[in-house]
Amino acid sequence: MLKPVRIALDAMGGDVGPQAIIPGAARALQRLGDVRFRFYGDRAQVEPLLRQHPALADVSSVHHTDVTVRMDDKPSQALRAGRRVSSMWQAIEAVKTGEADVVLSAGNTGALMAMAKVCLRMLPGIDRPAIAGIWPTLRGRSIVLDIGATIGADAPHLVDLAIMGAAMARIVLKVERPRIGLLNVGVEEIKGLEEVKTASRLLRQLTLPSLVYHGFVEGDDIGRGTVDVVVTEGFTGNIALKTAEGTAKQIAQYIREEMGRSFWSKIGYLLARRAFDALKQKLDPRQINGGVFLGLDGIVIKSHGGSDTIGTANAIEISYAMARYEILSKIRESLDLTREARAALLVEGTGSLERMAAPHRARQDELGENKVVGADQSMTAKATGT
């Protein structure tokens, strides 16, 4: 019999904190069953809500904290004020100590990444983290990474993203050998930044039993579902994500305006209501809520800061899947199989994407936005969901 998945929840994270986290967990429990929850936050706020859901209370424990990381805190501020004492830190630490299998927070993304890097550290051989998101497509769903953890990437890092993204796709998409595409300005091999072209050559050279390299893909291929995993660096990935979210809202607004324009349009809406409801479901970002932090030596999931009960429940289901199907073991296995080949790739050096990102990171370090207290590491604070 499988052991229940233990999920540590930052109960104070997000725009409404426990008002969304607790009922979201109750909703997820109805679907999952074999799960246990550890809530970290203000006991006075968490326990009254928990009592409204007896089934959830039976499989949960509450761990009081006095400090909450604010949504507008800089990562350096969050670490100074919240290290070891905040709900976010203690939820992450539960994974490190083995008390939980996965941590979920709807809090400040930059702070969550900074704390996770300090507390959990990176996987051996991985220098920089990534955020992977689930993307609705015409063929179902795909994985896109990086969607905002790190700005700029060299070719070996893009290869690492492909390996980690493939591991996630095997769990989420149930595909044994996911098709991988590198996001580029064209599909021709001569197009794009040198670093992306180098990464493409490296992926073709590697013999990876865990994935199939498709080649370059363009922006419109993401929604088409041309590949299972789209790999890019965090700057372009985050722009693609925000553009898609904005386009979905724009389409929904157009439909609402047209449906209310005349009597006949209202009649048309009523006749096609089932189809419109299905479209609304596909465009609803709550259905794919939950960004996975890859590259860390522990499983960390980021829920959108504005998530409601439905969005939270879906993020918990992603958390459950990543832990139940052992995403870390799959990533470690893939990295071990390619360790020597990936080490040889380092001689390729860095290229234009890395040079493009260097001034940005230097400026952020100067402002103190990316300095990690107590460790000689830095990170990119800007990411999704903050």
Curated annotation (Swiss-Prot):
Its EC number is 2.3.1.274. Pathway: Lipid metabolism; phospholipid metabolism. Residues 359-386 are annotated as: Disordered. It is found in: Cytoplasm. Pfam families: FA_synthesis (PF02504). The keyword Glycosyltransferase does not apply. Its main location: cytoplasm. Catalyzes the reversible formation of acyl-phosphate (acyl-PO(4)) from acyl-[acyl-carrier-protein] (acyl-ACP). This enzyme utilizes acyl-ACP as fatty acyl donor, but not acyl-CoA. Homodimer. Probably interacts with PlsY. This is Phosphate acyltransferase. It comes from Beijerinckia indica subsp. indica (strain ATCC 9039 / DSM 1715 / NCIMB 8712).
